C-alpha cells in the first residue's frame, strides 16, 4: 500500500500531466525504443505512428494518478490490459524497463525533484506488481487447461476463404495435432508474424469467429489500407503455411443466462466477435430473444451474410437486420435490410428493455452512435458491453 505522503505527491502532479498531454508518452516511447529496440518486436508500431498508443498510455497514467486512493475503480482497466499483455507474452522483467524509462521521462521533461520521482517510483512499483501477479495467473490458467499452452504455438492455415471484398477468414489447426484451449465467445487470438518483409516481429490480435470445439480456431481479417500485417495475411499467407499463436485471451466475452435477451450490435469487421457469440448462443439452445444488428457500407463489403442467414433459419428467436449506408436497390427491398445509418428505433420489434444485454463492436464513432441510441431507449450503461480494436477508448 502507498502511504498518504506518496499519494498526495502523486495527486499534486495531475495538473502537470494534464497540461503536457500525450507529449509525455511520446517522449517515453521514443526514449524506450531508442534504448531498448528489442521491444519493437512486441509493440504495434502502426499504433505508434498514428498516436493511438501514446494517447492510450497517457489516459492510463492519468487514470492511475486520479484513482490512486481508490485502486479498485481501476480493476476493469487492469483486467483488459493484463489480458492484452498476456497475448503479447509480457514478462516481469519488462516492467522494470518500462519503469526506468517512465521515471527518466518525468525527470527529463519536468525536473520535478527527487520527492516526486520517488513517489512515482513507488506508485509504479505497486501497479507493476498488480499486473505481474494477474498476468502470472492468466498464464497459469491458459497453460493448465486441456489443450492450453504458454507462449506461442505453431498452427497451420488449413482454410483461407474470402468472406467479402475486404474480409478473409482463416481456419487454423495446431501443427502438433493435439487439442487446443477452449475460449469464451468474444475473445481473440494473438498472431505472431516473422517475415523478411518486416523489420521487426509483428503481433496482432484477431477475434475468434467460431465457437469452441477443441480442434481448430477461425479468425477473420479485414484488409486495412495501410495495414502491413493484414496485407501479408491477405496477399502472402497461403493454405498450408504455419503461423504462431498465443492462447486465446480477452476481457470482452458473452456472459448471459439462457433467459437473458441479447443484442449483438456491430459494424464492419466488428461483427467478428459477435459471430462467435451467435454460434455459441445457438449451440447452447439459448431461450430468450437474440438480435443481430449489423451495419455495412454496402453488400460488397458485407461479410458472413450467408452464414448469419443459415443460423437464422434454425434459430426462431433470432431477429437479424442490416443497415447499408450505400444500399443497392435489391438490398433495400429486403425485409431485413435498411438504407442509411443504423437506427434502432426503426426495428419492427422493439428491443426489450428489461434485462437486455447489448454487445457492441466496430469503429469507435459507430459504437458511440449506437450506445447513445441504446441509452435514449432506456438501456442502462451496465447493460452495454463493448470492444475496441486497437488501443482502448471510452465510448
Swiss-Prot record:
GO cellular component, one term: cytoplasm
Alphabetized InterPro entries for the sequence: Cbr1-like_FAD-bd_dom, FAD-bd_FR_type, Flavoprot_Pyr_Nucl_cyt_Rdtase, FNR_nucleotide-bd, Globin, Globin-like_sf, Globin/Proto, Hmp
Highest taxon, organism lineage: Bacteria
Entry's localization field: Cytoplasm
Residues marked Involved in heme-bound ligand stabilization and O-O bond activation (site): 29
Domain FAD-binding FR-type: residue ranges: 150-255
Class of this enzyme: oxidoreductase
Positions of the catalytic residues: 95, 135
Record's keyword annotation contains Nucleotide-binding: no
Keywords, in A-Z order: Cytoplasm, Detoxification, FAD, Flavoprotein, Heme, Iron, Metal-binding, NAD, NADP, Oxidoreductase, Oxygen transport, Transport
Enzyme Commission number(s) from the entry: 1.14.12.17
Site (Influences the redox potential of the prosthetic heme and FAD groups): 84, 387
Cofactor(s) needed by this chain: heme b; FAD
Coiled coil segments of this chain: none
Chain sites annotated for binding heme b: 85
Keyword Heme carried by entry: yes
One GO term of the biological process aspect: cellular response to nitrosative stress
Binding site for NADP(+): 268-273
Domain Globin as annotated: residue spans: 1-136
Region (Reductase) location: 147-395
Single GO MF descriptor: oxygen carrier activity
Function: Is involved in NO detoxification in an aerobic process, termed nitric oxide dioxygenase (NOD) reaction that utilizes O(2) and NAD(P)H to convert NO to nitrate, which protects the bacterium from various noxious nitrogen compounds. Therefore, plays a central role in the inducible response to nitrosative stress.
Domain notes: Consists of two distinct domains; an N-terminal heme-containing oxygen-binding domain and a C-terminal reductase domain with binding sites for FAD and NAD(P)H.
HAMAP family, sorted: Hmp
Protein name as annotated: Flavohemoprotein
Organism: Dickeya dadantii (strain 3937)
Amino acid at each position: 500500500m502507498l502511504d498518504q505522503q506518496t499519494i498526495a505527491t502523486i495527486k499534486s502532479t495531475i495538473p502537470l500531466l494534464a497540461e503536457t498531454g500525450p507529449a509525455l508518452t511520446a517522449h517515453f516511447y521514443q526514449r524506450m525504443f531508442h534504448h531498448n529496440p528489442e521491444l519493437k518486436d512486441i509493440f504495434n508500431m502502426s499504433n505508434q505512428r498514428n498516436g493511438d498508443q501514446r494517447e492510450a498510455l497517457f489516459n492510463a497514467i492519468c487514470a492511475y494518478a486520479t484513482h490512486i486512493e481508490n485502486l479498485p475503480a481501476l480493476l476493469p482497466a487492469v483486467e483488459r490490459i493484463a489480458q492484452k499483455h498476456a497475448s503479447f507474452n509480457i514478462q516481469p522483467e519488462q516492467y522494470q524497463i518500462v519503469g526506468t524509462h517512465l521515471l527518466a521521462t518525468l525527470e527529463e521533461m519536468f525536473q520535478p525533484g527527487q520527492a516526486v520521482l520517488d513517489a512515482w517510483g513507488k506508485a509504479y512499483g505497486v501497479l507493476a506488481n498488480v499486473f505481474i501477479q494477474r498476468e502470472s495467473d492468466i498464464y497459469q490458467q491458459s497453460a493448465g487447461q486441456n489443450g492450453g499452452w504458454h507462449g506461442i504455438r505453431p498452427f497451420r492455415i488449413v482454410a483461407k476463404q474470402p468472406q467479402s471484398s475486404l474480409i478473409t477468414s482463416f481456419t487454423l489447426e495446431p501443427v502438433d495435432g493435439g487439442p487446443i484451449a477452449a475460449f469464451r465467445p468474444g475473445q481473440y487470438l494473438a498472431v505472431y508474424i516473422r517475415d523478411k518483409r518486416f523489420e521487426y516481429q509483428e503481433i496482432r490480435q484477431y477475434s475468434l469467429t467460431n465457437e469452441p470445439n477443441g480442434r481448430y480456431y477461425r479468425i477473420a481479417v479485414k484488409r486495412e489500407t495501410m495495414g502491413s500485417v493484414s496485407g501479408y495475411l491477405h496477399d502472402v499467407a497461403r493454405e498450408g503455411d504455419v503461423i504462431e499463436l498465443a492462447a486465446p485471451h480477452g476481457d470482452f466475452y458473452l456472459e448471459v443466462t439462457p433467459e437473458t435477451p441479447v443484442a449483438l450490435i456491430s459494424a464492419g469487421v466488428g461483427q467478428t466477435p459477435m459471430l462467435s457469440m451467435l454460434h455459441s448462443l445457438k449451440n447452447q439452445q439459448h431461450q430468450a430473444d437474440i438480435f443481430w444488428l449489423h451495419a455495412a457500407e454496402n453488400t460488397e463489403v458485407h461479410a458472413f451474410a450467408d452464414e448469419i442467414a443459415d443460423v437464422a433459419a434454425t434459430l426462431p428467436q433470432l431477429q437479424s437486420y442490416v443497415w447499408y449506408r450505400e444500399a443497392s436497390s435489391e438490398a433495400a427491398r429486403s425485409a431485413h435490410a435498411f438504407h442509411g445509418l443504423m437506427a434502432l428505433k426503426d426495428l419492427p420489434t422493439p428491443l426489450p428493455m428489461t434485462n437486455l444485454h447489448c454487445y457492441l463492436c466496430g469503429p469507435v464513432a459507430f459504437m458511440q452512435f449506437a450506445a447513445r441510441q441504446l441509452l435514449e431507449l432506456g438501456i442502462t450503461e451496465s447493460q452495454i458491453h463493448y470492444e475496441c480494436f486497437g488501443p482502448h477508448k471510452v465510448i
